[in-house]
Amino acid sequence: MKKKIFVLIVQALCLATGFSQNPRWQMIDKTLIPARADLDVRWEAPTKTIPSKVWIYRLLPNNFSPEAISNVVMLCSFTTTNRIEQNTNGTAFQSPDGSRKLSISFPSAQIHYETPEPRLSPTNLAKEVPPMSQLPELTTNLLKQVNIPLSAVTGFFETDKFNFWQPLTMYYVSNTIITNIAFRAVNFRRTVDEIPIIACDGGSAYFGNYGKVSKLLITWHNFNRYKSSPTLKPQAIIQLLRQGKALQEPVPLDVGYIDWPTVKSVTIKEAKPCYFAGDTDWLYPFLWLDTNVDTGHGIVDVGIDCPIIDETKP
C-alpha cells in the first residue's frame, strides 16, 4: 500500500513539474522580454475576450469513426482494393501507379492525402477548378464528411471560419498573357472552449481539376480535461511583463531589433487567449497580446505571448 501511494505521489510531482514548463515558452523564434520594474505598460484592451478560467488538456489519439474513414476514402477516389495497410494504428491507401497516397493515423490523429503536383503549361491548363465562391460550400461539406462540427473551426488573420487562397501562374505567349490557377485552397484551425489552437489541430484542403480534392491534411485529436485554473487579471499580466515573463514575437525586418531596456512604453490594444501544444501531448493556454511599443524612435506593432494563468502553481 505504501509503495502504491509513493508511486502516485511521484507521478503527481512529475505532472506538476511538466505543467510549469508551458511548451509555448520553448519556441526558438521568440525573444524573451528582459525584466524591467519601471516598464511603462498601459492596458487599453477589452477584457471580455478573456474567460474567467481556462483548462489544460491532454491530447489523445483519434481512431476516427468508420463513417468518417469511409467518406474520406471515397472523397479521395479510393476503394477497398487500394488499401495497402490496416492495423490498430490506422490505415493507408495507394493508387495502382503509386502516385496518390492516403494515410489515416490514429496515434497522431491525422488524415493525410497527397497527389503529384500537376505539370501545367500554356497548352495544359488546369480544368474546371471551382471558383472561390464555391469553396465555403465545398469546405463545409468536407468537414461534415469527417464529422468535424463547424462550431469547432475558426480561421486565421481575424477571419471567420476559413481562409481561402489560390496560386496564380502567368504565361506570356505570342504577346498574350495567359493566367492559370492550378487549385484553390482552404486553411482552418481548431478551437476548444471557443479558444483557437495554434500550430496543432486544424487542416487544409486543395480543390483542383473538376473540383476534386488534390491535397488534404487534417489533424484532429481527442481531448481529455486535466485541470482548470482561473485566468490572471490585467494588473497581474502587466506585472508579468515587468518581471520578464513574456515573449516578443518576431517583428518585420524593417523594424529591426527592439532595445527593451530603452523602450518608452507598451500599450496593450488587444488580448486573446490561445492554446498551444508544440511537440508535447499537453494543450496549454497562453495569452497573445497585440501591443504598440514606443521605442523612442517610433511606434511599433508587436505581438507578445505571456501566461494567462499562474504557472507556478501545480
PLM region spans:
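Positively charged n-region of N-terminal signal peptides that target proteins for export
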Residues: M1-K4
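Bacterial N-terminal signal peptides
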Residues: L8-A16
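Preferential activation on post-signal-peptide N-terminal prodomains/segments
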Residues: Q21-F183, R189-P196, T219-K227, D310-K313
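Short, well-ordered strand-loop elements centered on a beta-strand within folded domains, enriched
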Residues: Q110-E114, Y210-W220, L283-F286, H297-C306
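Aromatic/basic-lined ligand-recognition segments
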Residues: Q166-N209, W260-G278, F286
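Charged, low-complexity helical/coil segments in non-catalytic cytosolic or luminal regions
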Residues: A205-Y284
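A cross-kingdom marker for long, charged
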Residues: P273-P314
